[in-house]
From Swiss-Prot:
Residue segments, region Disordered: 803-852
InterPro entries: DNA_mismatch_repair_MutS, DNA_mismatch_repair_MutS-lik_N, DNA_mismatch_repair_MutS/MSH, DNA_mismatch_repair_MutS_C, DNA_mismatch_repair_MutS_clamp, DNA_mismatch_repair_MutS_core, DNA_mismatch_repair_MutS_N, DNA_mismatch_repair_MutS_sf
A GO BP annotation: mismatch repair
One Pfam family named in its UniProt record: MutS_I
Family, similarity comment: Belongs to the DNA mismatch repair MutS family.
Name of the coding gene: mutS
GO molecular function annotation: ATP binding; ATP-dependent DNA damage sensor activity; damaged DNA binding; mismatched DNA binding
Pro residues composition-biased segments: 823-832
Name of the protein in question: DNA mismatch repair protein MutS
Record's GO cellular component terms: cytosol
Keywords: ATP-binding, DNA damage, DNA repair, DNA-binding, Nucleotide-binding
Source organism of the structure: Halorhodospira halophila (strain DSM 244 / SL1)
Binding site for ATP: G621, P622, N623, M624, G625, G626, K627, S628
Length: 868
């Protein structure tokens, strides 16, 4: 019988033991959650929970007697290793209610009192063993608002970072959820807002949790204020509603106050460059298109030496700012560190504990001894960091030096209270240092002197009994004893009382040894109780200093992120970008930050110039020639600049950018029933509706998924709208050579191409961007590189010659126009005649960018040209 069914009869107690009635009563409160029910040194699961856990964790499923006439399925995990099991369950999207023994088994009649102390869910993790150290673990709530708006609230319980924002529509909400990538999402049960894809666990909560007035009261109580104006949130009804619903969920699952959540950040969409969900995926900022983390921007840029610095750096990359003052301050700080100080800063920070998350556990009362030594070691580094920062010419670094503080009293307390290398938990003692507390020292002394006393007692009893093999010992079951062999046991004094009989020995106790046992065991118990009380008080004392300690933790994270930017600038030859007041993008010698690191050969740098007279670069050239790389590197350079980092270029000047759009690559969206072409058109529509004159737009191969004329017509109309109506700064790559005529029609459209050199039927990609349109597509040569069979290539060449001569033959499948006559496009722009092709090819060569094989093929090609 299932646990949920059994719970219905638990109240009358028929057929159930008292302990099982207790279990069923508690389980009834958490019907959808796995219940870890503490029994001694194990957490046990029963009924359906046991069967589910056995499958998910690959642990043994057994039974425990009978209840209501049926065997009870049971499985269990040791308390000592519970975190590893919780980690596996949470990764599978499960939630676990932790039910602890809160009564004393020695004084309780019947089942010991138990209660659920916490529900572990994917979005409420705080233990290091359950978290990814460089990724935020966010709990996010979404509340629908008026006029199609949405309120979004996010909390990282493991650090206390709490933020809200308002999304104006569904598209913006999707973009924000793609940026945040929450571990758990809270939605109202009466709303049709879809949960995002990608492993996020969605929880549907009662609609009354999303009632504004009660949500606002919860938020005010949490922040300890009577008004939200100081946080800039008083008028944000939907975000406040989301924040209150989030806090209601935490109240139910955590069963504890959250003192480390004392501030609220309102994120304005106008403060940051907007990047929609598709563009964020295409740019591969933290995750590649396969969902992994290799070959991403973060994998190249994040060399931070602390986990909290890495998380902050990734937030900066995910949310490049538009606020010039903040970005300029970061650039100045990176420049000051890059002059040499970054190495000293990083070596001082190396090995620093994750102070943000430690402080969260301090606030929640779950900090362990090694958390406190990690905090102590981190705080001991602050004076050296302050000295280093005081020598640097940067206002932001000077401010960070002040925010670090030195916390001398806290450092002194931790140095006196905790031993250098404490055990993992305080359960068995040995955490508090000698000399910290007189009472504890006295109790420990009594226990430690026991060995000397027992050695003396053993010598006395041997002399008194004349038995040289007599020994005094101890075990946990019977306590202290005097042991002699069976053959000698009949001659013991009357004061000896038999305690235990073994196969070859007898064990006795004497009144003197009994008194000593009571004193020692009492001293040990009292010492352990005293140590636990001292530890709890120590954690409470640290919690009272939470706000200044959190400020220092934030400063440490920011310093680490800035030092990582500086290290990348020095190691990878990045330059400080210039921020201009006038719109435009000018990049000299730009490089793709990720591709550059993945190549064995030197990366071929290229220039980009977009301004009022060059609003659109129409890019042609062969597949594999580097068009997509060229476009992506432009967007990534802009993103890095506005995140506060230096950029891979010889020079970069960037004007204001409000949005970055990328329409690069596409695949079928099978889950939503959308074809590749439908995905492409949806993304294109989003760009045409939302791009502005200050947007950076990347468009790659629009119109590939339909017929040639349809695709060309759509690409032409899209490019015209971007160039003439929207006037966004656009990189537009195409294989439709007819589109190069746009340069002759619309001012601001400029043709550029990716260069390649041909040798017979082979092609060498030079990856250099040149003005003017490409003179051919090299499609057959690329097909040959891909391994297309020679017979197919031969047939393709014959068909190509036929098509180019105008005699394409009657295929019998002419396309009928859907809306009228097929469009008539202006003739494509013709490339200027090349007076000396050999000279032109040599001038355009980049020797450093050629592999040995490319160089050899180029030489053969040049020789063939000379013969002609």
């Amino acid at each position: 019988m299932a646990a949920t069914q059994e719970a219905e009869t638990a109240t009358n107690g028929a057929g159930h033991t008292p302990m099982m009635r207790q279990f069923l009563r508690i389980k009834a409160e958490y019907p959808e959650t796995l219940l870890f029910y503490r029994m001694g040194d194990f957490y046990e699961l029963f009924y359906e929970d046991a069967e589910r856990a056995a499958k998910l964790l690959d642990i043994t499923l057994t039974t425990r007697g009978e209840s209501a006439g049926a065997p009870i399925p049971m499985a269990g995990v040791p308390v000592q290793s519970v975190e590893s099991y919780l980690a596996r369950l949470v990764r599978l999207g499960e939630s676990v209610a932790i039910c602890e023994q809160i009564g004393d088994p020695n004084t309780t009649k019947g089942p010991v009192e138990r209660q659920v102390v916490r529900v572990v869910t994917p979005g409420t993790l705080t233990e290091d063993a359950l978290l990814e150290e460089r990724s935020a673990n966010l709990l996010t709530a979404v509340a629908p608002g008026p006029k199609g708006r949405f309120g979004v609230a996010s909390l990282e319980l493991s650090s206390g970072r709490f933020s809200v924002l308002e999304a104006p529509d569904q598209e913006a909400l999707t973009a924000e959820l793609e940026r945040l990538r929450p571990a758990e999402l809270i939605l109202p049960d009466d709303d049709q807002t879809p949960a995002p894809e990608g492993g996020c666990v969605a929880q549907r909560r009662p609609s009354w949790h999303f009632e504004y007035d009660s949500a606002r009261r919860l938020l005010l109580r949490q922040l300890g204020t009577h008004d939200l104006s100081g946080f800039g949130a008083e008028e944000l009804h939907a975000p406040v509603t989301a924040a209150g619903a989030l806090l209601q969920y935490l109240n139910e699952t955590q069963r504890a106050a959250l003192p480390h959540v004392g501030a609220l950040t309102v994120e304005s969409r106008d403060e940051a460059i907007t990047i929609d969900a598709a563009s964020r995926r295409n740019l591969e900022i933290e995750h590649n298109l396969s969902g992994g983390t290799e070959h991403t921007l973060a994998s190249v840029i994040d060399t931070s030496v602390t986990a909290m610095g890495g998380r902050l750096l990734r937030r900066w990359l995910q949310r490049p700012l538009r606020r010039r003052e903040t970005i300029a301050a970061r650039h100045a700080a990176v420049a000051a560190l890059a002059d040499g100080a970054f190495a000293d800063v990083r070596s001082t920070l190396e090995g620093c504990a994750d102070v943000e998350r430690i402080l969260a556990r301090v606030a929640l009362g779950t900090a362990r001894p090694r958390d406190l030594t990690g905090l102590r070691d981190a705080l001991e580094r602050l004076p050296q960091l302050q000295i280093l920062l005081g020598q640097l010419n940067s206002h932001r670094l000077q401010a960070l030096g002040v925010e670090l503080d030195e916390h001398p009293q806290t450092v002194d307390l931790l140095q006196r209270a905790i031993i250098d290398t404490p055990p993992a938990t305080v359960r068995d003692g040995g955490v508090i240092a000698d000399g910290f507390d007189g009472e504890l020292d006295e109790l420990r002394s009594m226990s430690r002197n026991a060995d000397d006393y027992l050695a003396a007692l053993e010598a006395e009893e041997r002399a008194a009994t004349g038995i040289p093999t007599l020994k005094v010992g101890f075990n946990r079951v019977h306590g202290y004893y005097i042991e002699v062999s069976r053959s000698q046991s009949g001659h013991m004094p009357e004061r000896y009382t038999r305690r235990q009989t073994l196969k070859a020995a007898e064990r006795f106790i004497t009144p003197e040894l009994k008194r000593f046992e009571e004193q020692v065991l009492s001293a040990r118990e009292r010492a352990l109780a005293r140590e636990k009380a001292l530890y709890e008080q120590l954690v409470a004392d640290l919690a009272s200093e939470l706000t200044p300690l959190q400020r220092s933790a934030s400063a440490l994270a920011e310093l680490d992120a800035l030092a990582a930017f500086a290290e990348r600038a020095r190691s990878l030859d990045y330059v400080q970008p210039e921020l201009a007041d006038t719109p435009g993008v000018r990049i000299e010698g730009g490089r793709h930050p990720v591709v550059e690191q993945a190549l064995d050969a030197p990366f071929v740098p290229n220039d980009v110039r977009l301004d009022n007279r060059r609003r659109m670069l129409l890019i042609t050239g062969p597949n594999m020639g580097g068009k997509s790389t060229y476009m992506r590197q432009t967007a990534l350079i802009a993103l890095l600049a506005y995140a506060g980092a230096f950029v891979p270029a010889q020079r970069a000047v960037l004007g204001p950018i409000d949005r970055i759009f990328t329409r690069i690559g596409a695949a079928d969206d099978l889950a939503s029933g959308r074809s590749t072409f439908m995905v492409e058109m949806t993304e294109t529509a989003n760009i045409l509706h939302n791009a502005t004159a200050e947007s950076l737009v990347l468009m790659d191969e629009i119109g590939r998924g339909t017929s040639t004329f349809d695709g060309l017509a759509l690409a032409w109309a899209t490019a015209e709208r971007l160039a003439t109506r929207i006037r966004a700064f656009t990189l537009f790559a195409t294989h439709y050579f007819e589109m190069t005529a746009l340069e002759q029609i619309h001012p601001g459209v400029v043709n550029v191409h990716l260069e390649a050199a041909e040798h017979g039927e082979r092609i060498v990609f030079l990856h250099a961007v040149r003005d003017g349109p490409a003179n051919q597509s090299y499609g057959l040569q690329v097909a040959a590189l891909a391994g297309v069979p020679q017979e197919v290539l031969k047939a393709a060449r014959e068909k190509l010659r036929s098509l180019e001569s105008g005699d394409g033959g009657d295929t019998g499948s002419a396309q009928l126009p859907l809306f009228g006559p097929e469009p008539v496009f202006p003739p494509p722009a013709q490339p200027e005649p090349e007076p000396d092709p050999i000279r032109e090819a040599v001038e355009n060569l980049d020797p450093d960018g050629l592999t040995p094989r490319d160089a050899l093929e180029t030489i053969y090609w040049l020789k063939a040209q000379c013969k002609e």
